[in-house]
């Protein structure tokens, strides 16, 4: 029946039986979705990254000011502000130190069954990480953490908590029932007065840079300026996080197409699902970064279109590509070993007269971890060997 005079179906329903029938249908559909895709199990990231510095920096052997983090419960990108180097400050130190601190907090707050500290949300995590840093500099940062403690209607419902300060961005792609991947979530850049060169950022400088600098401003930025989002996590989701070097130069469709072309659409049946190989994730991140740099070069005498105009912007460029997979017992066991090894190293480094770690024992430990199957959520040893759990 059409609504009077409007030529459309009525949307105001007061019939109780109709309401109950609709509710029952929605519950059945959600139960089917949970049964097929979720299985009420903890999830984690299986991730890899790739970075490429500004071409001029590469020619002059200067440091890449970006940092990336790939760990089971948290992926992140931090983009150091290179102009700080004009004051004799290494722009790469603060981003790396910040992500190292964030990774440590995520390890102790978010690992399922291994957490020893309460998780109070992404803003608190970045605040605590910032307080743990000492380096001078300025950086933007974006983190995405998997929180496996969330429950909806009494069932485990992992969430991805995204926190962004500045102009790094993140996309989450999900495969639908029709087998196609679609962007289900995207952040927006935080830039001051719309200026493409001036992102919101966390800074720490001394009086030689700014005699009137207030060190408390960083905490104000974290508390009042952080963009925080929560998104349901589903096994098989693809997460793409990148610095502005990616998102200034590539349209979202271009990033999605790279992922679609390179990452096979796997069955969403949990019994048949297999994580993507880590080398493939690295190559996807690499192709996204290379495509970003290519957009800053003329083609057939013309500069290509980019989100910020013709020719985009040459920049340090970094990208993390992750797949959401099940957190398995094998993965949990591996990380128990890693944490034990880290605590042992910490004790040795804090005690005078102690002998250094036996390299053969350390190598054997790494070998044991690397033997964990990819189906068990990939070998974290590969991440550990790159330092700070794939902190680059």
Predicted segments, located by residue:
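PP2C/PPM-type serine/threonine phosphatase catalytic domain
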Residues: 1-392
């Amino acid at each position: 029946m059409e609504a009077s005079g409007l030529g459309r179906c009525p949307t105001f329903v007061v019939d109780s039986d109709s309401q109950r029938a609709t509710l029952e249908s929605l519950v059945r559909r959600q139960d089917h979705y949970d049964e097929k895709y979720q299985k009420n199990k903890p999830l984690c990231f299986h991730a890899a990254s790739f970075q490429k510095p500004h071409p001029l920096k590469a020619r002059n052997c200067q440091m890449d000011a970006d940092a990336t983090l790939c760990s089971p419960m948290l992926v992140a990108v931090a983009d150091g502000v290179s102009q700080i180097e004009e004051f004799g400050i290494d722009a790469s130190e603060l981003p790396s130190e910040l992500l190292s601190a964030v990774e440590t907090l995520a390890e102790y707050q978010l690992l399922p069954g291994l957490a020893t500290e309460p998780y109070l949300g992404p803003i608190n995590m970045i605040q605590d990480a910032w307080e743990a840093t000492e380096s001078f500099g300025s950086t933007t940062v974006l983190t995405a953490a998997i929180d496996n403690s969330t429950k909806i209607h009494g069932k485990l419902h992992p969430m991805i908590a995204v926190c962004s300060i500045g102009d790094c961005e993140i996309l989450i792609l999900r495969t639908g029932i029709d087998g196609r991947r679609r962007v289900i979530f995207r952040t927006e850049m935080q830039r001051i007065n719309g200026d493409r060169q001036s992102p919101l950022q966390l800074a720490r400088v001394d009086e030689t840079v700014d005699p009137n600098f207030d060190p408390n401003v960083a905490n104000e930025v974290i508390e009042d300026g952080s963009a925080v989002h929560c998104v349901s996590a589903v096994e098989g989701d693809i997460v793409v996080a990148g610095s502005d070097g990616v998102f200034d130069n590539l349209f979202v469709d271009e990033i999605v197409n790279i992922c679609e072309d390179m990452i096979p659409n796997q069955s969403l049946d949990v019994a048949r699902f297999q994580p993507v190989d880590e080398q493939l994730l690295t190559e996807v991140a690499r192709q996204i970064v290379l495509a970003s740099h290519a957009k800053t070069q003329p083609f057939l005498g013309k500069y290509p279109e980019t989100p910020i105009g013709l020719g985009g912007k040459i920049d340090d460029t970094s990208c993390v590509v992750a797949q959401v997979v099940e957190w398995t017992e094998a993965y949990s066991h591996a990380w128990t070993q890693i944490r034990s090894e880290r605590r042992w190293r910490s004790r040795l480094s804090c005690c005078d007269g102690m002998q250094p770690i036996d390299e053969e024992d350390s190598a054997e430990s790494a070998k044991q971890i690397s033997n964990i199957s990819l189906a068990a959520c990939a070998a974290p040893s590969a991440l550990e060997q790159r330092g700070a759990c794939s902190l680059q």
